[in-house]
Swiss-Prot record:
Protein name, per record: Holliday junction branch migration complex subunit RuvA
Protein species of origin: Cereibacter sphaeroides (strain ATCC 17025 / ATH 2.4.3) (Rhodobacter sphaeroides)
GO BP of this protein: DNA recombination; DNA repair
Taxonomic lineage of the native organism: Bacteria, Pseudomonadati, Pseudomonadota, Alphaproteobacteria, Rhodobacterales
Listed HAMAP family: DNA_HJ_migration_RuvA
Region of interest: Domain II: 65-143
Gene: ruvA
Length: 224
């Protein structure tokens, strides 16, 4: 499994790029959004990748973030959504937009992707709505982008640190923080997100981050 490619951008096509990794060129299919973010040929680039295997075809699909890759993988679990349709949805909405549309049951936004009809858009929302909050939590903790590494340098040994005596935050604080981070990543104002998460946490103090996100989204829906 090829999970990440880092090298020099050699060529940009209409729906793919060619990345030179120490003399070996890899064709990586990307969304319109990812293609627009690519640097000029000759510059360093890195993409998280998913290898899609068919009976007579092997294709690499590339993503600038790990959360985008995970959303693509999840979209392909829906009947009627292949690798290219998943890329079209991500290209039209981005990972945050997909998470928002699915969480709010907004099939019309999913349908805005080229080649995605109303039946498939509705199926995406219905089948993935319960899974969206978990990926949203991951999005709040995942690194922003894949870093291009052309040459590796040896690392110096890290200095020893004294054991921390600071107490770890309680689990509830971690859950509310993760939920707040996920909602702000979706574009909600921090004050609105904090108020919704606080209310959701008060209604269900034992809720984990995914449950808090689901409850907060219901509270925020009338404002969007």
């Amino acid at each position: 499994m090829i999970g990440k490619i880092s090298g020099i951008l050699d060529f940009r096509g209409p729906d793919h790029v060619l990345i030179d990794v120490r003399g070996v060129g890899y064709i990586v299919h990307v969304s319109d959004r990812t293609l627009a973010a690519m640097p000029a040929p000759g510059e360093g680039v890195a993409l998280y990748t998913e290898l899609v295997v068919r009976e007579d075809l092997l294709q690499l699909f590339g993503f600038t973030t790990m959360i985008e890759k995970e959303w693509h993988r999840l979209l392909m679990t829906v009947q009627g959504v292949g690798a290219k349709a998943g890329m079209a949805i991500l290209g039209a909405l981005g990972a945050e937009g997909v998470a928002r549309a699915i969480s709010l049951g907004d099939a019309r936004s999913i349908q805005a992707a080229p080649g995605v009809g109303p039946k498939i858009a509705q199926r995406v929302v219905l089948e993935l709505k319960s899974k969206a909050p978990a990926l949203m939590v991951m999005g709040g903790a995942a690194p922003a982008r894949a870093a291009a590494v052309v040459e590796e340098t040896p690392e110096e040994p890290a200095p020893r640190r004294k054991p921390s005596t600071r107490a770890a935050p309680p689990p509830a604080a971690n859950h509310t923080g993760d939920a707040l981070s996920a909602l702000t990543n979706l574009g909600y104002q921090p004050s609105d997100a904090a108020q919704a998460v606080a209310q959701a946490s008060g209604d269900n103090p034992q809720a984990d981050a995914a449950a808090l996100i689901r409850a907060a989204l219901k509270l925020l829906a009338p404002r969007s």
